UniProtKB/Swiss-Prot annotation:
It catalyses: dCTP + H2O + H(+) = dUTP + NH4(+). This is dCTP deaminase. Keywords: Hydrolase, Nucleotide metabolism, Nucleotide-binding. It comes from the Bacteria. Pathway: Pyrimidine metabolism; dUMP biosynthesis; dUMP from dCTP (dUTP route): step 1/2. NCBIfam families: dCTP_deam.
Length: 189
């Protein structure tokens, strides 16, 4: 299994719609020329953006967090260019990009250093072979202060690993519960 380069990522995006919308270069400035957190193709990965759709965790219901019986009322939904995450809390978002993962490929997501250096951690489970959809992102604010996330700017990097052997059973074959998700998706069992 080897990590894939920018050439492979570009080819797969352009010929097989692996990433839509796709940016073949690194975007570091907005339309007005202001610096942003970069997104697009990097040497050995792809930096994704989060959309304007956020779910901010709140404890207004004083409930127990249970992944088997998750209460959607534990979130406040917002649509904005900026998301403020309360201290020691978290928020969910989704990528702008839609992914179609090849059957012989596994994708691992890592947070961007710009956010990590501010105490904001991005967590995403691997994108499995033949999974497709928009990725639900989890941002943890590990600081005792409110933290800001910017929509339509880079938030995480996807690394693509291609196996030397095609898997016997893909995520699609298993009927994975998050297959085809397009919005911010809460836990499912």
């Amino acid at each position: 299994m080897s990590i894939k380069s920018d050439r492979w990522i570009k080819r797969m995006a352009e010929q097989h719609a692996m990433i839509e919308p796709f940016e073949p270069g690194q975007i570091k400035h907005d339309a007005a020329g202001q610096r942003i957190v970069s997104f697009g193709t990097s040497s050995y990965g792809y930096d994704v953006r989060c959309s304007r759709e956020f779910k901010i965790f709140t404890n207004i219901n004083s409930t127990i967090v249970d992944p088997k019986h998750f209460d959607p009322g534990s979130f406040v939904d917002i649509e904005s260019d900026v998301c403020i995450i309360p201290p020691n809390s978290f928020a969910l978002a989704r990528t702008v990009e839609y992914f179609r993962i090849p059957r012989d490929t596994l994708v691992v997501c890592l947070g961007k250093s710009t956010y990590a250096r501010c105490g904001i951690i991005v967590n995403v489970t691997p994108l499995e072979p033949e999974w497709e959809g928009r990725v639900t992102l989890e941002f943890s604010n590990t600081t005792p202060l409110p933290a800001r996330i910017y929509a339509n700017e880079g938030v995480a990097q996807m690394l693509f690993f291609q196996s030397d052997e095609v898997c016997e059973t893909s995520y699609k074959d298993r009927g994975g519960k998050y297959q085809g998700q397009t919005g911010v998706t809460l836990p499912r069992t």
